[in-house]
Amino acid sequence: MLSTHHHQGNSSSSSSSSSPSQTIGGSDLSNISALPLPLPSIFTTAQNQMNPPILFPPTSSLLGGSSNTPSFLLPPSSIMSSNVFPSHDGQYPDMPNMVDQYQIHPNQNPHYNYQYQLMFMQQQAQQNQPPQQNQQQQHHQQQQQQPQHHQQMQQQQHHQQMQQQQQHHQQMQQQQHHQQMQHHQLQQHQHQHQQQQQQQQHQQQHHQQQQQQQQQHHQQQQHHQHSQPQQQHQHNQQQQHQHNQQQHQQQQNQIQMVPQQPQSLSNSGNNNNNNNNNNNSNNNNNNNNNNNSHQLNNLTLSQNNTSGSNTPSPSTKGKRKHHETSNSEKKDSSGQTIPKCTRCNEAASWKHDKRRWWCKECKKAFTPGITKMQQVPQQAQLQPLQNHNQIIPQLWDSQQNNSSQNTPPTQPQNNMNQINHQLLQQQHQQAQLQAHLNLTASNQQVPPQLQQQINGGLPNNNNSLITQNTLNSLSTSVSCPPCPLCRGISSWKHDKKRYFCKECKKPFTPVGAGLSPSSSPSSPKKKSNITPITTSSTSSSSSTPSIINNNNNNNANSSKNNTPKKQLSPPPSVLQSPSSSSISQSPLQLNYQTPTYSPNPSLPSIGGNLNSLANSIKPDGGILISGLSPPKSSSSLNNLNSFSNTGALLSSNGINLANLGNPLSQLNKKQKKRSDKDINDGGVQVLVSCVDTNVNNCSSIIPDGDSW
């Protein structure tokens, strides 16, 4: 605002009004910066002509001219110019105006700069003048300025037009002169080129005559077959020479088309002519060199032919036959006959070398004519493992065939290794099942449902067919061996030798063929430490936990219809004391007893829910719940009924342990730490046993250590 008012004072601007309150608003924001800000020309010169300023209207505010609001934000209306609203000082005489202390007033103290006071006085003098005189003066100045400016513009335009005409005339003369010079030079060049062409044609005719004479002499002495490659070579040379001549004529035509295009500068025209002449001379030299090279090649060929005719040898005959075959191949390639792949019978993608083509599908090169069919059928690769038992022997036979030959198998090795591993483990499991059945049949009678599961190896209780899901889960469960620490199978391949256990969160190496070190036969001395539990254990303290016998039918169904992972796997992690670490945990010893028994981790676990129960139970009193250790007495079936009664009595104490229906419950980290401490302290074991042969309800009895 400071600089605009300064310019308006010098150029007698029209931003003025009669109200004295606008002097306050007209000088707002003037003391913000000591130097005037440079404003663009929109605010200074263009507003001084006839029109009032657009961005800076007559300075008035909503409050009747007080300087609370900036003046350029308000429209120049008649309501604002007349004193409709009372002033700030009239409305609020006691409240000081906070904005006015930074602005200049007529009654200002003299400590402000003298320049601002002079500017303020000039603005007052301009505003006191009537606005009509300012408009008349501006209009008169514009009328005086307009004719002078108009005359100057006309003179400049006329001068520029004359200069342009002279330059255009000079350019036209120069272009005509250049075209004449170019035409003359091209005529000379064409004359020289015609002479050179005549000489070349004469040399070619002489050369052809010599070749014809040599051919006639050669045909008399040799057979007609030996002359065929020579004629083809001549024909190719003639075609190449004609092709070179055609290219040279096309270049000449392009050179002749050049002078029709207008050129602006003489120097560029001369340079272009010189370049064209140089190019033409280079082309002529190249043609001469080509002719000389053709002559040399023809002479050497003729010499070879004459020497071959004098002394024919079997080596030259073989070479000639090779040339004939290469020419036939060239004809095939020029005729664009693409052969088909000998492996996949699809069109070849490109030529690999002189004889072989490349197939994109096989990613190999092949020679058309030599068949190399793939030895392994692709159906075995692409087909998923749906019929598990049928595909495995096919793949095994195909791998043996491939290993007997030198060619590597196209099937990936990882799948074959996994399938071999699965086959070996299945055979090992079947052998162990048969050995175990032989042992148990001699000692005791096996329950019918257990015998059915052992014979089937799969849950086939409802006489249903073996589905695809069971086969897939069987293959996945067999591929991962059990962990030797926690005996869980939820693991994956960690590296070449080790597997990773989810439960232990540690990698482990499978011992032997998937057997853990705890599967060694246990000694009868350690078994004798744990005596069978009788009904006298009901007098234990009330702090011992017990299991509520609920969900009986659900437990039976879930134990029957478990996934094959749980049935083929050994029981999950069971915490044991050091004295009972070697005690077998096989579910087959639930209802009967064998004196010399080596447990098998790969047998189907009937008590999978009981094992998960043993995982989930950890009481606070330092009592451990171990796995499925067998009762020692021969009258175990009689004791089982008493166990159910004692379980019902213990359940009346209100201590509820985990539900039997959760097969996937796990220990927390804190409970694992406590159980590790309790192992070192030697806690009391809890024997979990089934009440009935149908595994309807189970209960764990925790006796006191002093009672037995």
Swiss-Prot record:
Residues 11-21, 123-219, 227-316, 516-590 have a biased composition (Low complexity). cAMP-responsive transcriptional activator regulating late gene expression. Essential component of the developmental switch between early and late development. Binds to a number of CA/GT-rich gene regulatory elements. GO terms for biological process: adenylate cyclase-activating G protein-coupled cAMP receptor signaling pathway; autophagic cell death; positive regulation of aggregation involved in sorocarp development; regulation of transcription by RNA polymerase II; response to catechin; sorocarp development. Its main location: nucleus. One of its GO terms (molecular function) is DNA binding. Sequence repeats lie at residues 339-368, 481-510. Residues 1-29, 123-339, 511-604 are annotated as: Disordered. The gene is gbfA. This is G-box-binding factor. Residues 324-333 have a biased composition (Basic and acidic residues). It is found in: Nucleus. It comes from Dictyostelium discoideum (Social amoeba). GO terms for cellular component: cytosol; nucleus. Residues 591-600 have a biased composition (Polar residues). Keywords: Activator, DNA-binding, Nucleus, Repeat, Transcription, Transcription regulation.
